[in-house]
Amino acid sequence: MGIRKYKPTSPGRRGGSVSTFAEITRSKPEKSLVRPLHSKGGRNGHGRITARHQGGGHKRAYRLIDFRRHDKDGIPAKVAHIEYDPNRTARIALLHYVDGEKRYILAPVGLKQGDRVENGPAADIKPGNCLPLRNIPTGTFVHAVELKPGGGAKLGRAAGAAIQLLAKEGAYATLRMPSGEMRQVEVACRATVGQVGNVEHANISWGKAGRMRWKGKRPSVRGVAMNPIDHPHGGGEGRTSGGRHPVSPWGKAEGRTRKKGKPSDRLIVRRRSKKKR
C-alpha cells in the first residue's frame, strides 16, 4: 500500500493524503458474504443518544469475516481477490476453498492474489495461515489472536497490527501486544501468521473535518466551550472550568473506567507502555 498526497487546490485538500488502493483487485464485494448494516446514529431503542459523536456517514454493507476458521482444518484455499472493507482499517482477502465455499479473512502483509492459504495444526508458517499458538515458533509475528480457544479472533485485527509470540510455558503462551502490553493466552488459542496489511494507514492525514463526517463521526465539543446548562464546566468568563476536576456532562469524574480486579488481570504480565508526550 502507498499514500498519495493531495495537491493544495483548496484549504481542505492542503496537507491531506489518501491511500493509493494499489493492492485492491476487485471493487464489488461477494454478494453471499454481505449483510445490511443499519445506521443507529448513536441512539438506543427509545431514540435517545447513548453514544455521542456518532451519526451520518456513507452507507455501508457489512462483510462477514471468518474470525474462527476451525471448521476448515486441512482444506486449502486460494486467494481470489484482495478487497476494500469500509467497516475496518485492514484490507480483506476473499478465499475460494477447494470444497467450493467462499469466505473473507483479514489480508496480512505479503498475501496476494493466487496464494494458497491453509488452516489447522499442520499448516505451514506462512502469512495468512491459521493455526494454534502451540504450533507456532516463538518470535513469530501473528495477528487475529483468540482470547479463548474457539472464541474467534479478538486481538490484533487493526491495520498494521502485529503481535509477537515471546514464549510458551505449560498451557500458556506469552504475547507482546502492539501497545507494549505483555499478556498470556492459552496455547490452544489460534492465531494467523503475519502482520495485518495496510500498514501505512496510520500515516494518512485526513486533511479536513468533512472526511471524518463521511466516516460517521460527529464533532466533539469541549465542556468549557458550553453554557452552564449544558455541562458542569460551562459558563464563566474565558476558558475556566470553575476550579473543579474534569467531569463528564453528567457530573461523573473522568478518568479510568476499567474494572479493578478484573479476572483476566492475572494474565497480564506487563501493562501497556505509556505514550510519549
UniProtKB/Swiss-Prot annotation:
The record's GO molecular-function terms, alphabetically, read: rRNA binding; structural constituent of ribosome; transferase activity
A Pfam family that this protein carries is Ribosomal_L2
Q: Which SMART domains match?
A: Ribosomal_L2 (SM01383), Ribosomal_L2_C (SM01382)
Compositionally skewed regions (Basic residues) per UniProt:
37-55
Ranges for region Disordered:
1-55, 217-277
Q: Which SUPFAM superfamilies does the annotation name?
A: Nucleic acid-binding proteins, Translation proteins SH3-like domain
The UniProt keyword set, sorted, is:
Ribonucleoprotein, Ribosomal protein, RNA-binding, rRNA-binding
**One annotated Gene Ontology cellular component of this protein:** large ribosomal subunit
Give the domain of life: Bacteria
Question: Where do the TM regions start and end?
Answer: none
| Similarity field | Belongs to the universal ribosomal protein uL2 family.
Record's NCBIfam families?
rplB_bact
* Name of the molecule in the record: Large ribosomal subunit protein uL2
